[in-house]
């Protein structure tokens, strides 16, 4: 599954999302909307108003959403429970 995370400089929720995805071993592409303004415009056109925006297959969301990350891959401790 292809995962893309749209971020911006100095975005605390973006950093938290990146860490959570790395901790679960996901491969993902990051696009910084400060460097790619047309990406920001495209996200706004899709109704997103907050970063990060994560697009993972058929799922997409904005903000730091551990619940959505867990839908992609449960946290290690959840798998053993």
Swiss-Prot record:
Keywords: Disulfide bond, Electron transport, Redox-active center, Transport. The keyword Transport applies. Residues 1-81 form the Glutaredoxin domain. GO terms for molecular function: electron transfer activity. One of its GO terms (biological process) is cell redox homeostasis. The keyword Protein biosynthesis does not apply. Gene3D superfamilies: Glutaredoxin. Induction: Induced 2-fold by hydroxyurea. It comes from the Bacteria. InterPro entries: GlrX_NrdH, Glutaredoxin, Grx-like_ET, Thioredoxin-like_sf. Belongs to the glutaredoxin family. Electron transport system for the ribonucleotide reductase system NrdEF. This is Glutaredoxin-like protein NrdH.
